[in-house]
Structure formats: structure tokens, C-alpha cells
Amino acid sequence: SPLKIGDTSQVKVARKYRYQKHSLSLEVEMRYVLGTNGDVEGMMKGHTILKSSPGKLALANIQGVGFHGILQQQNRLYLSSCINPSGGATVTSEQFRYNRNTQDVRFDRLLFWLLGKGNIQDQRCLWTQMSVPLNATNPEAAKKILENAWVSWYRRWESQFPEP
């Protein structure tokens, strides 16, 4: 049976992008997830080719962007993270919950809840997974490529986060 992301979580929209520069191909998968607890490792196990046994994500933090996880699997290097509706990007459910507890107690969220349109906490996320093959580059160079692409991607989508 498929792994649940959280009790009420659902992937509303999923998109796949591929970018080519010289001999390097960058693949990006983005899913708009509702009702999530923000556990990226759990989402990776439940929704991607990493179902088999993804191992542990190595966590990293970029100032002004937030957290992301890096994982090498077979001949690819992956970067995965959740763009939050407010607050920096997160990888673990603890980071996601911290953002919700510190960012969502606002008048507009309270009004949203009082009108019966949802929870005070905004449990949505733009779950992004990027990857590059390791045949054309080494893991250190691949990590730099992924992190540079991630910063641009994050800045673009953070400002365009969908309305609830």
C-alpha cells in the first residue's frame, strides 16, 4: 500500500521539468502538496523512484532560503525540499511544524479559520526534487549545480506560492 504523507495529505498538482546545459541535464519534479506534515524523506519514499530505500538525506541550510536535503542514489545526485507558504524551506516535519507555529498565527489565517475555510496552520508545501546524473560530473560539482539551481528555483516559487 502507498505510504501516506500525513493523515489528510494529497498531491494536488505535479509537474516535471528538464533543463539542458551542454552535456548536463537537470531534472526537476515539483508537487503541490496539501495537508502535509512536511516530512520530505517520507514523501520521497511514497511518491518517487526512490521508493526502494532512499537512505538518509544530508541536511544543509542556505541563508535566506532555508533547508534542503542531498542524497546520492545509484548514478544521480538529488536535492529535495519543501517551499513553505511562509518561512524558509524545510526538510523535516520538525522544521515544518516550527515554521507553522511561528509564521501562521496571523490575522488573515485566523480569519480564514473563523470563516470555516481551513486550519489556522497552513499545511501546504511546494515539494521540489531536483537531480543531475553523476556520469558527466563528480558529486561535489553536482552538489554546487543543484544548490545554485535550487536557490533560483526557491526565489522564483516562494514569491508565487499559490493562494489557499
Where are these regions (language model features)?
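Accessory, solvent-exposed terminal regions and/or long lumenal/extracellular loops of proteins
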Residues: 119-122
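Surface-exposed amphipathic alpha-helical segments
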Residues: 124-164
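Short, solvent-exposed recognition patches
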Residues: 1-116
